[in-house]
């Protein structure tokens, strides 16, 4: 459980878990800045991240990065992603589920949620604002992907929803 504010820079990792059935609870604000910097990283199947705190990602960093099948991310806080190669939530694996309930702002070439795998679902119920060339709200690369957009989506400036 991460309760306080965390700042991760210069290629560092805030929380890293290797193994199946891992859960990370982030209740405090997480700031990730810089290439190869990661807020929370899980390597294993059935990984789960509960992001109740705010997530601020820039400079090519990754907020949440899970490698493994059947991963789940519940994002309830405010997510801000700025700059090319910056990704708020990335999952590499099949049967991933991402629930974005908080407000998300994606700008300057950043990506809010990226899932690389088959049978993935992204449930977007919070407000999402995407602004700027090459900025992307939600991207699924794989077969049988499903994006459910129940929240407001505002796309401008050459961005992609």
Predicted features and spans:
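Extracellular, beta-strand-rich repeat scaffolds characterized by small/acidic residue-biased motifs
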Residues: 19, 44-46, 59, 68, ...
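Beta-strand-rich solenoid/repeat architectures in extracellular/passenger domains
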Residues: 1-11, 21-23, 28-36, 49-60, ...
């Amino acid at each position: 459980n991460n309760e306080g504010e965390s700042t991760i820079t210069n290629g560092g990792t805030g929380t890293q878990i290797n193994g199946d059935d891992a859960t990370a609870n982030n209740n405090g604000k997480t700031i990730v800045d810089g290439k190869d910097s990661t807020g929370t990283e899980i390597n294993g199947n059935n990984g789960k991240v509960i992001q109740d705190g705010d997530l601020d990602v820039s400079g090519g960093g990754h907020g949440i990065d899970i490698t493994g099948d059947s991963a789940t991310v519940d994002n309830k806080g405010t997510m801000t992603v700025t700059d090319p190669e910056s990704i708020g939530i990335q999952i590499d694996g099949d049967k991933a589920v991402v629930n974005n309930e908080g407000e998300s702002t994606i700008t300057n070439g950043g990506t809010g949620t990226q899932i690389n795998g088959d049978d993935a679902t992204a449930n977007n119920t919070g407000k999402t604002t995407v602004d700027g060339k090459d900025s992307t709200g939600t991207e699924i690369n794989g077969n049988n992907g499903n994006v459910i957009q129940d929240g407001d989506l505002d796309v401008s400036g050459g961005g992609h929803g």
